[in-house]
């Protein structure tokens, strides 16, 4: 493949290759401020490629590959090439990373302490993280929270934030256009647009944080909150982890310490602004 880009996000060094120039051009623009891999080996290789040579030009169909693949995954149209590249990068980390316990979660930090937000697609965790990250919080990650196996510290993984549908307009109004990727339509999740994290999140990607609150958000439901007991938090987090089973005892120990030491709360909210206000109120109580 003649089109490539190498860069680092937190502890992961990515080598991304493509049969097409367009997706790599998008990656180079959006990841322009991330460190390169000069003199360092990549820890994850992602590829987006044509199923057959002629599919580079005739009805291009983008297949996701790399160190790890899903053989029966359906191809994407070339118009969704950036999304395919991001999905390929996610796949390599989800299936291959063993240095941390991975939680499918977003996370933000303030004063060295972090909130981990866990929820299914549509729960609003990405939008909450994006909005908090534009305020007094530092974004640690949108896709994965990386928990240390020995020290309970979160390693930042500030990839592009995947904005979806209504959340796009909310963020477009408050960030400069150069931090936004192309509008991607026709995806299974609707309209997607990627947002580059603020400069401080990228510059401080090697500064870890201590988990201080586990949050389980639900967007669109009845407003309110309830404490989540450690047993329930443990089960929810095992469901959200992509490598808990593969890690074995170290993963179990890390997750047990997390739910033992960190309070957990479930919140419902009807709007993003209401969600942000609820998070800030919870944080104020935690610090009181």
Predicted regions and their residues:
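Short, P/G- and charge-enriched loop/turn segments at secondary-structure junctions
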Residues: 93-96, 200-202
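Post-Walker A alpha-helix
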Residues: 128-129
